[in-house]
Amino acid sequence: MKMSNMLVGTLREVPAEAEIESHKLMLRAGLMRKMAAGIYNYMPLGLKVIENVKNIVREEMNNAGAQEFLASALIPAELWQESGRWDAYGAEMFRLKDRHNRDFCLGPTHEEVFTDIVRNEIKSYKQLPLNLYQIQTKYRDERRPRFGVMRSREFIMKDGYSFDKDQEGLDLAYEKMRKAYVNIFNRCGLDAKAVAADSGAIGGSGSAEFMVKSEVGEDDVVFCTACDYAANIEKAPSTPEHAEKEELMEVEKVETPAVKSIEDLAKFFECSPKKIAKTLIFQADDKVVAVVLRGDREANEVKIANAIGEVIELEMASEEAVKEATGAAVGFAGPMGIKVDMLLVDQEVANMYNFIIGANETDMHLKNVNYGRDFEGIVGDFRNVTIGEKCPECGKEITISRGTEVGHIFKLGTKYSESMGATFIDEDGKAKPFIMGCYGIGVTRTVASIIEQHNDENGIIWPLEVAPYHVSVIPANVKNEEQATKAEEIYNELRKMGVEALLDDRKERAGVKFKDSELMGIPMRITVGKMIGEGQVEFKLRNGGEVETLSIEEVYNRVREEFERANLSL
């Protein structure tokens, strides 16, 4: 491609709305342009990168025995109603009606569609196993789109679905997909790690996320400092800290005027936050749920939602709901006598002695409270783990890092096949539900994650296999006929070799061209300058290194070396 013919618009200034490096650089390098909140148009340069990532995904999925398919993005409500997810998916689903007043949605995911296809096409165990996938645009009405394509309302995703006759078959399919994902992210130049995860609205049993460590990631990921254990904080089990046993004391009511926060309570009672139990009140659809945690702990909303079961939306209760449940102002809630539909008590609180709680009375607290004697509830793990707790597998300390999810694999089991009546005839002539798996990769999010891991102060540094162009050929002075002619000859020869080459034949200063080449992240640069009269050009790698002066034949060999180093063939 010649840049004089190319739709490209690099920006020197950082767009005001961009917060993270990938968002800034995707806009500055001319990869995309914003159309509305969370909605982007992909420019030619950006589309080439997306297609390169798609091709990697496609190759690895095909190598793993999956077949590509393309389903409709517009889905009738009936399929989602069959699975029970029409209501369960919540406000993130784009819903619409056609001219006949029939309900449809724009697919945020396609479990129902693929289950419907397979139940109509596959009748016998002899037709199994089956693994189908598609690469398609998805739609989710995010409450707060942010970070460019990291959390957008329209995004490109690879979603795949496996169908097996038994659990053994699902386990095999799941492992094949895990290996394929490892290959995909390695080829994309991403340092991604599989971590244990919650299944969320997708459902099912086993689940793993592929996480990329990132300071701007939206997830907290728990890692063991000694073994390979890793999990999303939503999934990671906490280790209760057992308090030292005490003799049970009588409950006392204490006046605490305007003392609401844990910090203020600890000062007032001259105690550690570990001697305080806070009561958080949530609205879970039409239920009011109270959760009791140790004062210094954070609630884990995923664990709470899983304990409640089938929750569409979980949020902190309104001030009015709190007053109705407690009879008091906000800040004085406690588990004794509270009027809620469900009372969840963290396992740590159940092992505390003589602790302090809200009295469900404004400006009042109770001390010397004990679980079992003074109140009871559903005991479980309802909090986030913290740095330094014990690994659930080896017992050593854990640490926590921020991460971005780029892929997710699930063992769905029979969740969808049973709810939608998707069955096959087994070896004994009996109808059985398909055992399903689900496998997703965020293609556009993967592109952004590559940029997050591969950039410097000058712009993007694309790994060779995903780069929009492999080599940028720059005539230092396009008005110099020899430089312009030789640059075009080199450009044409590279293309014959199978190299994606970009000829910057614009009537711009060499410095401008160098800056654009670096900003766009082109892995190799060949500059045709004053030394071309001696048959020499300059070669430079985007990811560092000095400028090399080479003959034209040597520069072709140098390009081949970089392809070999990246395990790519020409």
Swiss-Prot record:
Homodimer. Consists of three domains: the N-terminal catalytic domain, the editing domain and the C-terminal anticodon-binding domain. PANTHER family: MITOCHONDRIAL RIBOSOME PROTEIN L39/PROLYL-TRNA LIGASE FAMILY MEMBER, PROLINE--TRNA LIGASE. This is Proline--tRNA ligase. Pfam families: HGTP_anticodon (PF03129), tRNA-synt_2b (PF00587), tRNA_edit (PF04073). The keyword Metal-binding does not apply. InterPro entries: aa-tRNA-synt_IIb (IPR002314), aa-tRNA-synth_II (IPR006195), aa-tRNA-synth_II/BPL/LPL (IPR045864), Anticodon-bd (IPR004154), Anticodon-bd_dom_sf (IPR036621), Pro-tRNA-ligase_IIa (IPR002316), Pro-tRNA-synth_IIa_bac-type (IPR004500), Pro-tRNA-Synthase_IIa_type1 (IPR023717). It comes from Clostridium perfringens (strain ATCC 13124 / DSM 756 / JCM 1290 / NCIMB 6125 / NCTC 8237 / Type A).
